[in-house]
Amino acid sequence: MPSFLRQLVPSSVDFWCFDRMSFGGELIPDFLLCYRNSRGFNWAYVELESPNVPPLIKAGRLSSKLNEALGQISDWRNWLRDNISYAREHHGLKQIDAEAPAFVVIGRRSHIRAEHALKYRALSADKTSVMTYDRMAEIAFTGAEIES
């Protein structure tokens, strides 16, 4: 899994993938990615949901799983804003930033109805990217760029 997730961050010599690291006991990202470049340590949060769960329901609203995943990311960021020194010093998360990019991978491309495509694209904002497993595979296997 780490080599698959590595495609989410810019290429660098140094890369680490932390599995289920705890923020404040109850807040646990599926993966925390770190890479080092000339700016130092850079971080990204990853939340994986089922490929069988659509990101949007028929009416074009967020599915409960996507809503939950986005809520978790918000909770991680809020915890880090309040506890940044603790995270850096006691968890060893050098230079971690509450505003680091986050990725939610959920569902398949076929789950997104044509009439909801614009709404789906608009979900990727504020340093959070929502993508299907198809998009994740496309990035990993073809080297496609992540759209910002």
Regions found by a protein language model. Name each.
Residues M1-S148:
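Charged, terminal alpha-helix-loop-beta segments
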